[in-house]
Amino acid sequence: TLMARKDLPINSLKDLVTFAKANPGKLSYASAGVGSGQHVLPAALWHLAGADLIHVPYRGAQAAYLDLLGGRVDLFFDLSSTARVHVNAGSVKALAVSGAERNPMHPDVPTIVESGVAPLDLESWFGYFVPKKTPMDIQDRLRSELAKVIAQPDLQETFRKAGGKPLSLNADQTRALVRRDV
């Protein structure tokens, strides 16, 4: 979720990019450090949108939040599950989410693509992998057992509450996902 400090006079990603293009280097965005997800995702967004913002790297997300909430930086992109607390409290404004679809935690917040500023669709995902030479019968058993775990209603609900979408992909689907995203 892309968050803006609550007193920033911008209420949409489209307006933010318009302002940033007209005022290069005037807006800043925090990250949890150089190379972190909170750095790479917005850097890609600003690049694709043709906007020049100042990157302010912190040593972790907590320090970035302190300065966003204190109004010392303008923007911060973080996981929706973490951002939710601050968005719901009204201490920041949510401008966009990075996934292909709106996030259930922030159903009124448009995606980056919906905002029309960049063709950017990025989501975090986790997978289980085994060495290439693992026998197929072991791979099949692991896949089957993991699918049973992922299908459990309590686990599904835990993922949803945290803003996640639990998926159980077969080998071909997983290979396609890795080829697309990695």
Feature annotation, model-predicted:
Residues 20, 44, 48, 62-72, ...:
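Short helices/loops that flank or line small-molecule/ion binding pockets
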Residues 170-182:
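Extracellular/periplasmic bilobal clamshell ligand-binding domains
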Residues 1, 96-132, 169:
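Periplasmic-binding protein-like
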